[in-house]
A protein has these predicted regions:
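Hot-dog-fold acyl-thioester-processing enzymes
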Residues: 1-82, 148-255
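Generic structural hydrophobic/aromatic packing signal, biased to beta-strands
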Residues: 3-5, 36, 85, 139, ...
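HotDog/MaoC-like acyl-thioester-processing domains
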Residues: 79-193, 267-317
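Catalytic-pocket segment enriched in acidic/His residues
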Residues: 231, 238-282, 298-300
Length: 317
């Protein structure tokens, strides 16, 4: 419940057991990005102050301790560039899950500002008490060279290569259609929703507490400004969690098969975000269909802040 509140998602299936049971689950459902909260159970997690160690956020001074290497989770380095969840099934409250970490693919490419960028996948496998897979989470970090010299950043450092602004596919009525949440959908259909209005700094603090990610960039103004930013900005995973609100009116609860996002640029307090879901393909099987969605989240200036995709279980029509 606390996690759902932290991403501004008030779908009752995340709060009330009776509602979840009506949807076919035996307890309240976990929100789509809830697995980020596993970091609460990592005793060495370095985005949370550790006993006896100097925390690098502000105290008397804007920056404390040695920040020559900016801490990041699970051994990665650099910025969180992308995240992907593969849902083997959706977990519910009361379950015990077993967690295993491993490193996935590593690759490099030339950055826009010169120098090589190295991308690393950190894969977290969640299994139930019987050893059956529940969720696979893939965190993609990109190592950069911006944290040298004076160690200061700018919003340009946090902005990835802009995603192409492709037009939606032409709406097609015919063989390729499916039923999501009781409604017929076709390739080219779009669904748009304002997912947050006037994002508050308090929402960033709520997400820090719910997820366990207390990096000072997201709640500590003196630290963020000392590092060259205009102030605090939202966690990429907060933006991804808020974006998922758009699913509530479009798909059935627990129907997500896969959900991925790429963080294009920072989201600042005060911004209003609108998410568009576009049906780009429908894969029809013998018993069920899979709807492919392209995802765009934009700020009030119509700038892309997140792009993504989802695979959704649906009914044939």
């Amino acid at each position: 419940m606390m996690f759902a509140r932290s991403v501004n998602d008030y779908n009752e299936v995340y709060y009330h057991k009776a509602v979840a049971e009506q949807a076919g689950f035996n307890h309240v459902l976990a929100p789509p990005t809830f697995m980020m909260a596993v970091d609460h159970y990592d005793e060495t997690y370095n985005r949370r102050p550790q006993p006896g160690e100097v925390w690098f956020g502000s105290g008397r001074d804007p920056i404390s301790g040695d920040v020559s290497v900016r801490p990041v989770p699970k051994g990665g380095s650099g910025f969180h560039a992308e995240e992907r969840f593969i849902y083997h099934r959706h977990p519910v409250a009361g379950e015990t899950l077993i967690v295993e970490y491993r490193t996935g693919k590593v690759w490099s490419k030339e950055g826009r500002r010169g120098g090589a960028l190295t991308f690393t996948e950190e894969i977290t496998e969640f299994s139930d008490a019987q050893g059956k897979p529940v969720i696979t989470a893939i965190w993609v970090s990109v190592a950069t060279v911006i944290n040298v010299g004076d160690g200061k950043l700018s919003d340009k450092d946090l902005t990835q290569e802009k995603a192409s602004d492709e037009n939606s596919p032409e709406r097609i009525e015919g063989v390729h259609k499916a039923v999501m949440a009781g409604k017929i959908c076709h390739i080219g259909d779009t669904f748009e929703k304002i997912v947050v209005k006037d994002l508050k700094r308090t929402q960033l603090v709520m997400y820090s507490g719910a997820s366990g990610d207390f990096h000072p960039f997201h709640h500590d103004g003196p630290f963020a400004r000392a590092k060259g930013m205009d102030g605090v900005f939202a966690h990429g995973m907060l933006t991804m969690g808020i974006t998922a609100i758009a699913f509530n009116d479009v798909i059935d609860d627990g129907a997500l098969l896969e959900y991925g996002a790429r963080f294009v640029q920072p989201v600042w307090p005060g911004e209003t975000l609108t998410t568009k879901l576009i049906v780009t393909n429908i894969e029809q099987g013998e018993e069920q269909a899979v709807v492919i969605l392209t995802i765009e989240t934009r700020n009030g200036d119509s700038q892309l802040v997140l792009t993504g995709d989802a695979r959704v279980q649906a009914a044939n029509f």
